[in-house]
Amino acid sequence: MKEKDNFEMIINLRKIKTGKRTGRSKRAVKFIKKVVARHFNAEKVIIDPLLAKSISKNGNDKIVSKIRVVVSKIEEKIYLVRLAIKSR
């Protein structure tokens, strides 16, 4: 199987949006960590601060519904999640 060193994925945050209004951005960051850990079998997931800020750009209770991220492998079972920049 091919090793996933640099991988781009879209994470749907709609389930987080349907939940309780308070603390949505914090739950979204935890959800992103959980999804990346599940897909890449990671022990540690590091979230870029720019990604955390872009999730809650309209406030902590008004998060985006989908987010495109790039997952990069730092070391064995340690991954960095960054915001993907659209290129056209």
Swiss-Prot record:
InterPro entries: Ribosomal_eL31, Ribosomal_eL31_dom_sf. CDD domains: Ribosomal_L31e. Belongs to the eukaryotic ribosomal protein eL31 family. SUPFAM superfamilies: Ribosomal protein L31e. The gene is rpl31e. This is Large ribosomal subunit protein eL31. One of its GO terms (molecular function) is structural constituent of ribosome. Pfam families: Ribosomal_L31e. One of its GO terms (biological process) is translation. Coiled coil: none annotated. GO terms for cellular component: ribonucleoprotein complex; ribosome. Keywords: Ribonucleoprotein, Ribosomal protein. It comes from the Archaea. The lineage of its organism: Archaea, Thermoproteota, Thermoprotei, Sulfolobales, Sulfolobaceae.
